[in-house]
């Protein structure tokens, strides 16, 4: 047989490019004060199904794992602080359905091909969209409908900021190069945070981040399925600014709001804002009582 040169191979090769859009995945962001309560609700919705909960630190993995275990849930855990043997055993328990739920840091998932993961919960917001897409994308690899839920709180931003600002241990980079890396990480964190606040289609935001076009309404994310009422607050903003200016910027936001609402609070009366501020709204007879 005559051996073919590399040129022949290159001529015959086909490059297959797949997009970022996976229409079977439902995306949702929930702003949560009590994240464990949200997790329990989600687990009830996905009872008997396989899922992953991603946490930002090993400590949180342990806390969430213990809380779920105490509630009688078949759960296992994975992070870099465990021994190789324990990580392998826990990974196998999840893959072979001996435990339906995995609580893990981002150390879990590389090279794992479990097609029937029905939900991925992010207990914390990741540091960038790349990490979120990769981790959320471990749901629904069999093409069946699956959910990707992000539980957001402001503390997530501060935690990620701390990690970014303290990531200065790379001796191969100069100080200038290190600052450039950190600046890019800050920008990526900002884009990730915007994802948690946008009222637009979450899928459109994600695809736009990765440079892919989207139609603007996917019908399979929390924003597209939520009815939002747009309210013009410019009038109220102007009134508030006028009140601040009239008070010569002497008082905090609470006192300004109390003045605009006609409150007879201790500060309003002490500063005689009820008498001297033109924007003070007199309370109704019912309010006085």
Give the residues covered by each predicted segment:
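Single conserved hydrophobic/aromatic residue that forms the stacking wall/gate
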Residues: 1-10, 280-289
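Proline-rich low-complexity regions
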Residues: 12-13, 126, 250, 283-285
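Helicase motor core with emphasis on the C-terminal RecA-like subdomain
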Residues: 4, 8-176
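C-terminal helicase lobe
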Residues: 73, 94-99, 112-116, 121-279
């Amino acid at each position: 047989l005559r051996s073919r040169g590399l040129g022949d191979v290159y001529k015959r090769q086909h490059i297959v490019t797949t997009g970022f859009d996976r229409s079977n995945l439902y995306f949702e962001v929930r702003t949560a004060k009590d994240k464990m309560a949200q997790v329990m609700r989600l687990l009830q919705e996905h009872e008997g199904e396989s899922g992953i909960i991603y946490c930002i630190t090993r400590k949180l993995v342990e806390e969430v794992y213990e809380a779920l275990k105490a509630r009688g849930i078949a759960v296992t855990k994975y992070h870099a602080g465990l021994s190789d043997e324990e990580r392998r055993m826990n990974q196998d328990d999840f893959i072979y359905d001996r435990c339906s739920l995995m609580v893990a840091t981002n150390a879990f998932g590389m090279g794992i091909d479990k097609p029937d993961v029905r939900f991925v919960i992010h207990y914390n917001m990741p540091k960038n969209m790349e990490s979120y897409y990769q981790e959320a994308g471990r749901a629904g690899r069999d093409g069946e409908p699956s959910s990707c839920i992000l539980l957001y709180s402001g503390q997530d931003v501060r935690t990620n900021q701390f990690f970014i600002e303290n990531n200065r241990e790379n001796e191969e980079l100069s100080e200038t190069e290190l600052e450039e890396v950190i600046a890019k990480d800050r920008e990526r964190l900002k884009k990730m945070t915007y994802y948690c606040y946008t009222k637009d289609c979450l899928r459109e935001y994600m695809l736009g981040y990765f440079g892919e076009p989207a139609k603007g309404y996917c019908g399979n994310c929390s924003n597209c399925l939520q009815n939002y009422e747009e309210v013009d607050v410019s009038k109220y903003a102007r009134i508030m600014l006028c009140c601040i200016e009239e008070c010569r910027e002497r008082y905090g936001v609470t006192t300004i709001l109390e003045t605009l609402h006609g409150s007879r609070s201790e500060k309003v009366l002490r500063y005689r804002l009820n008498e001297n501020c033109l924007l003070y709204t007199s309370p109704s007879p019912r309010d006085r009582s």
